[in-house]
Amino acid sequence: MIVCTTENIAGYRIDKTFGEVFGLTTRSRNLVRTFGAGLKTLVGGEVVTWTQLQDQARLEAIERLKNNADKIGANAVTMMRFDSNEANGIMSVVAYGTAVKVSEL
């Protein structure tokens, strides 16, 4: 499965457009780690726990995007983007794009 952030894929032509496809994940933060991260904000610097959580969520959202595209017969996703939201310690990440069928030129 090819996933790209561009409208076209070099060396491929788009044979069919299926439309929008997405992958979503929602995760909660570990209470103990959140407390430690809160202390980290007092002294400054990267909050590694939150960075890792967001990285894992983005990877999971991409995998779900690929699975959803595959289910409808696509072999690529173009114009892939991310959106995220966090409220009350719960983070949602969505990866979305256009599911397409491509073939090599």
Swiss-Prot record:
Coiled coil stretches, renumbered: none
Pfam families documented for this protein: YbjQ_1
InterPro entries noted in UniProt: UPF0145_dom_sf, UPF0145_YbjQ-like
Domain of life: Bacteria
Protein family (similarity comment): Belongs to the UPF0145 family.
Protein's name in the database: UPF0145 protein OEOE_0637
